[in-house]
């Protein structure tokens, strides 16, 4: 890995940069993964000075630094340029600053660009980086872009085309912070390093897979953005389908980025494109209505600030995906994601097929649960015997949870992903083929929903979504394993 690099952050005054990027860069610096041969150029429209920018950086890492001196030494590597992304003259000044810092920090012409801005500016920035020779083929040149990567296949394709005019596919890192989470990356270990699971990870033994992304909060201050996006675009097109690909892929030939990508790509290629009838049967949308939780009243989605009072945007999405592969043909991959649900949490449940009863005693299916957030860990439910003289069965659970100390020591997702980019490891990033396939599927669902050909189910705040989501699983003789509203 080369830690000799000039990092340029477009959108350096924004919330993401201050909450995530500067702390993540500091952790890399503190651990020695960023050497003294680095500098960060922050650009944004605000007319900040270098001194003020340094103070913003110091404030963002105040809880992480061992001393004020350490924080200030780190911040001294940060430089600021007020920048209008559509003004060519500003790129000329940026090139001059880049060249100066490259010489000052002996960065060997290595460049990393992070676009922490609205996607409509990505193409403009990439075009100017090339035309003003900031991207010049010297050293490594890598680009990190934030989601959302388009709003449908057409916009994503145009965005990709614009980036490819300056960068090669192998230089583009489409970030999905969920893929940087420690427990997501442990899925490989759970699956492929344990004979117990690897030999039964198929349709012969697995009845269904359940993926839940639950949020307790509403849309908060994101009403304007969310009303143009909705749960399907915001959570399913990226996080859900990326997680599904890790759960459904075959074992790669090796654990190199190319072999892992190849197996993930096969999952996206084999996603079944549902018919119009299946779209109506197997995909559910919902929107939270007003209500009370523990005596406190919460407003409906349509009453949220910056939301259309007649909005049909979904705050809840649920459905069943299928994969036409030898491993998982006919196995439903259920998903649900929503706002204002009972409890915040991201869980995966692998529900194994139910065995026949023994001695007249009904058996519950074995379930492997992968906890991704807020706690991390796994549990495996088994059928055991109650203590006593009679042969009565009772469920038992084998649990492993990461304690708070260990969780705190795990790399932040952005820290891990920036480290991967510096190491030129694109394993935990979305390749264009994956993005394209996911949008093709999401567009089919969105087309039907935008025409209001399926009901928009209301659900009470504090629930786990509309009843239709539970009825969906009942069609397959299944039920949601995680039901915190009944705990």
Task: Give residue ranges: language-model regions.
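Secretory/organelle targeting and membrane-embedding segments
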Residues: 1-145, 149-487
């Amino acid at each position: 890995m080369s830690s000799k690099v000039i990092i340029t952050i477009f959108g350096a005054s924004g919330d993401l940069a201050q909450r995530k990027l500067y702390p993540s860069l500091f952790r890399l610096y503190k651990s020695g993964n960023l050497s003294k041969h680095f500098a960060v150029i922050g650009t944004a429209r605000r007319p900040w000075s270098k001194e003020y920018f340094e103070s913003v950086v110091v404030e963002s890492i105040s809880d992480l630094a061992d001393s004020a001196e350490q924080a200030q030494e780190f911040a001294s590597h940060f430089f600021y340029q007020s920048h209008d992304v559509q003004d060519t003259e500003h790129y000329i000044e940026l090139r001059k600053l880049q060249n100066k810092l490259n010489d000052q920090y002996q960065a060997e012409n290595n460049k990393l660009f992070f676009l922490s801005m609205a996607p409509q500016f990505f193409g403009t920035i990439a075009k100017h980086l090339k035309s003003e020779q900031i991207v010049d083929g010297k050293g490594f040149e890598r680009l990190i872009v934030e989601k959302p990567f388009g709003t449908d296949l057409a916009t994503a394709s145009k965005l990709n085309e614009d980036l490819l005019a300056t960068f090669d596919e192998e230089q583009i890192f489409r970030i999905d912070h969920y893929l940087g989470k420690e427990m997501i990356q442990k899925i490989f270990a759970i699956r492929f390093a344990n004979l117990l699971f690897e030999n039964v990870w198929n349709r012969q033994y697995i009845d269904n897979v359940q993926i839940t992304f639950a949020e307790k909060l509403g849309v908060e201050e994101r009403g304007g953005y969310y009303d143009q996006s909705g749960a399907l675009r915001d959570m399913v097109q990226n996080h859900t389908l990326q997680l599904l690909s890790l759960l459904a892929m075959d074992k790669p030939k090796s654990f190199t980025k190319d072999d892992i990508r190849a197996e993930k790509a096969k999952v996206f290629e084999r996603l079944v494109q549902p018919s119009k009838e299946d779209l109506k049967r197997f995909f559910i949308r919902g929107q939270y209505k007003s209500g009370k939780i523990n005596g406190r009243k919460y407003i409906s989605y349509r009453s949220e600030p910056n939301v259309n009072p007649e909005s049909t945007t979904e705050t809840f999405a649920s459905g069943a995906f299928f994969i036409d592969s030898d491993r998982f043909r006919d196995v439903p991959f259920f998903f649900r994601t929503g706002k204002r649900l009972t409890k915040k949490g991201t869980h995966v449940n692998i529900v194994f097929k139910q065995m026949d009863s023994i001695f007249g005693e009904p058996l519950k299916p074995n379930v492997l649960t992968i906890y991704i957030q807020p706690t991390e860990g796994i549990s495996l439910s088994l059928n055991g015997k109650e203590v006593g003289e009679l042969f009565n069965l009772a469920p038992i659970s084998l649990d492993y949870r990461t304690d708070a100390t260990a969780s705190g020591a795990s790399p932040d997702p952005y820290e891990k992903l920036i480290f991967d980019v510096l190491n030129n490891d694109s394993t935990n990033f979305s390749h264009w083929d994956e993005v394209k396939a996911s949008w093709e599927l999401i567009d089919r669902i969105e087309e039907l929903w935008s025409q209001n050909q399926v009901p928009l189910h209301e659900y009470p705040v504090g629930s786990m979504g509309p009843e239709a989501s539970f009825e969906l699983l009942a069609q397959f003789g299944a039920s949601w394993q995680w039901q915190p509203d009944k705990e």
